[in-house]
Amino acid sequence: MPKKNKKVNAAILIIGNEILSGRTQDKNVAFISNWLNAKCGISVTEVRIIPDVEKIIIKNIKILSKKFNYVFTTGGIGPTHDDITAKSIAKAFKTKYEFHKEAYQILEKYYGKKNFNDGRKKMAKLPRHSKLIYNPSSAAPGFIIKNVFSYQEYHQF
């Protein structure tokens, strides 16, 4: 259970070797922080940037989901081999990592059966009992499980 505070708080967890190496510049922290503070009255009180390493993702999800009312993650939910965030979050919450029927249907419709390859199908695998976050920029949805919101790029909202 998240720690109860007088003010609702949140942490941001940026996941990606490309951020840590400097190959990619983060565009999400400022957007999420401004949006949560200005629109929702939620204080962002911690930001972490971690690599695409399962043990590290699991550890951080466990810690942050207990410490904060909300946790917002970015990165690691795409079609490539290093996109392991959804699977790691499932493990952190000790739940199954499986195809989400609605996510699968959305992605299959978007890409078409011919172009719906294994990498794209992987984006339809989520922790069991996740709720979808619809993506206005592409078909790839994010998800919510417990107090963790996982989305590829929040600045697209």
Segments from the language model and where they lie:
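Glycine- and acidic-residue-enriched helix-capping/strand-helix junction motifs
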Residues: 15, 19-29
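Proline/glycine-rich low-complexity loops and linkers
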Residues: 56, 84-152, 156-157
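Glycine-rich beta-strand-to-loop/alpha-helix junction loops that act as flexible
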Residues: 15-17, 73-81, 152-154
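Active-site-adjacent beta-strand anchor residues
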Residues: 22, 50, 151
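N-terminal small/polar loop signature for handling phosphorylated ligands or for N-terminal nucleophile
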Residues: 7, 30-92
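Extreme N-terminal starter segment of soluble prokaryotic enzymes
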Residues: 5-11
